[in-house]
Amino acid sequence: MINEVYQLIAPKLIDTAYKEIDLSKNEVILRPVKMSICKADQRYYQGLSNRAVLMKKLPMALIHECVAEVIYDPSGVFSVGEMLIPIPNTPTETDPVIAENYLRSSHFCSSGYDGFMRDYIQMPHDRLVKVPEGFDMRVASFSELVSVSVQSISRFEKFANSNRRKIGIWGDGNVGFITALMLHYLYPNAELYIFGTVEDKLNFFTFAKETFHVDAVPEGVSIDHAFECVGGPGSRPAINQMIDLIEPEGSISLMGVSENFVDINTRMVLEKGLNLFGSSRSGRKDFLRTMQIFAEHPEVGHYLENLIGDEFKVRDIPDIHKAFNADYMRNFGKTVIDWDK
């Protein structure tokens, strides 16, 4: 079976490659239905990542956020027509201590390995999770991003002390919104404080206790723990403001990606006995927990609909360029692709 794969071969240059699907494998064949563009995909497309690193990864198909329809399952575990979320992380080994998404040997779709921008996806059964019945497929398309927030919260539960009454989230973008929303449902008794820079975006956090512009935080505000969802050049002031406002022995979850080293106030980290930990990507456990949250709290999907920005029907390569170029101009929300191949 021949599969048409849409690969980025150079920044802003996409071409088709033809690869064979081995039907003798006991794996599921799916057809992508909806996709969502991630900032990492956008950096690759625009050529904004480190050029030497990018050239080692290309050519590759982009997109690691997707919902797909089952076309064929030789084992019969999944039914034809069933809607599933493919897990982009594929471990090649297991470790009793290190999670699958932190193993250096794991393969990740659209990061050196083909993403989901292809006619068909072939995946092992354990790399697929079911979408709850009746859930909005547009929101399901960016379930991977939600699972990244869930992964960070799971690590928070592992490292943070039991003082969890006041939690601060820095960042008023997509990751900040999703992380705050997940905390709202997983810790309904916690007070959530959002720190951002754009009032219009802060207004979306209707479930939070309070929102603050980072340049106008009142005296006396303090938090037990913090999540950094800023990244880029904003990481430095965000992390240092967290260090200033956090209570002793609090934990800080670092989620934002920065291309440059970030200077932080280590003196106060030591003086307060703070715990800083990183979080990246996600694994099967995080996807399952995400789907459980979707199933138990259907209103989460309605909140996440606020993130849906442009929607593009993609039939050919020019449509792909149109979707990526429009997404590049957005500063909030997710671009959803209707894969109509």
Model-derived regions, located:
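C-terminal hydrophobic helical "lid"/dimerization subdomain
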Residues: 3, 284-341
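Glycine-rich beta-strand-centered segment in the early N-terminal region that forms part
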Residues: 22-35, 49-93, 132-134
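Short glycine-/small-residue-rich Rossmann-like dinucleotide-binding loops
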Residues: 36, 74, 89, 230-234, ...
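Residue-level marker of beta-strand positions
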Residues: 65-67, 82-83, 120, 172, ...
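NAD(P)H dinucleotide-binding glycine-rich loop of Rossmann-like/cofactor-binding domains
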Residues: 90-166
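Mid-domain Rossmann-like dinucleotide-binding core that forms the NAD(H)/NADP(H) cofactor-binding site
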Residues: 135-216
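Glycine-rich cofactor phosphate-binding loops and adjacent beta1-alpha1 units
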Residues: 158-164, 186-187, 202-275
